[in-house]
């Protein structure tokens, strides 16, 4: 198993799909990395040489991925909450942030129904 950005990349998958195992790299970015490095998209990770894996490591290293990206997202949400802006308040209350209706839906964000106590 190749190890890129602290993640074990699955050997039995094609390069494009295997790179998506890294948090912060989707299919589009994965295809761009393969095009930039000159590695074919349909080659399996197990068939790559050690030099090609090193080239992939360098290409992935240019992006903010994994722990750094998670930390960046958490800090930006925390910043919104500290500012006290509308989006921050919605995050703090655990409600939808992007203008969705909450009268009937939003069960995922609000959690299970709480019965009214009499």
Curated annotation (Swiss-Prot):
Residues 94-118 are annotated as: Disordered. One of its GO terms (cellular component) is small ribosomal subunit. GO terms for molecular function: rRNA binding; structural constituent of ribosome; tRNA binding. Keywords: Ribonucleoprotein, Ribosomal protein, RNA-binding, rRNA-binding, tRNA-binding. It comes from the Bacteria. InterPro entries: Rbsml_uS13_C, Ribosomal_uS13, Ribosomal_uS13-like_H2TH, Ribosomal_uS13_bac-type, Ribosomal_uS13_CS. Belongs to the universal ribosomal protein uS13 family. Part of the 30S ribosomal subunit. Forms a loose heterodimer with protein S19. Forms two bridges to the 50S subunit in the 70S ribosome. NCBIfam families: uS13_bact. This is Small ribosomal subunit protein uS13. The lineage of its organism: Bacteria, Pseudomonadati, Pseudomonadota, Gammaproteobacteria, Enterobacterales. The gene is rpsM.
